[in-house]
């Protein structure tokens, strides 16, 4: 089964941010190493890192008219994603727990990938 993992950064220190600068060099290297190791996990297809939420645009069409709003649709925008093909939800949860954002102030949302058409 395929699962989509949505990575919500929350207060996770992001490279280039003030919070990132509070991490030691060893902590920064460990975070990068953890992500690199996750990307090598069999069945894992990493997505591209997403830009910061303030760079997002949200598009809706209401009564045929296009509406564009600055920022993410939800207050806490996603910072990344991946697709993990594994046996079951428990395996997806185990992988999600290894994502640095899960322990550094963020959260990982897991959804089964469905094919409707």
Question: How should these model regions be labeled?
Answer:
Residues 1-117:
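Conserved, structured core segments of small domains
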């Amino acid at each position: 089964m395929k699962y989509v993992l949505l990575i919500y950064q929350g207060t996770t220190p992001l490279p280039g941010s003030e919070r990132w600068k509070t991490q030691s060099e060893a902590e920064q290297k460990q975070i990068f190493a953890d992500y690199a190791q996750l990307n090598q996990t069999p069945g894992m297809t990493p997505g591209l890192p997403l830009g910061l939420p303030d760079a997002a645009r949200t598009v809706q069409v209401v009564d045929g008219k296009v509406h564009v709003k600055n920022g993410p649709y939800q207050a806490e925008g996603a910072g990344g994603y991946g697709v993990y093909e594994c046996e079951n939800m428990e395996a997806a949860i185990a992988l999600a727990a290894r994502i640095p954002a899960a322990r550094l102030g963020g959260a990982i949302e897991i959804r089964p990938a469905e094919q409707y058409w």
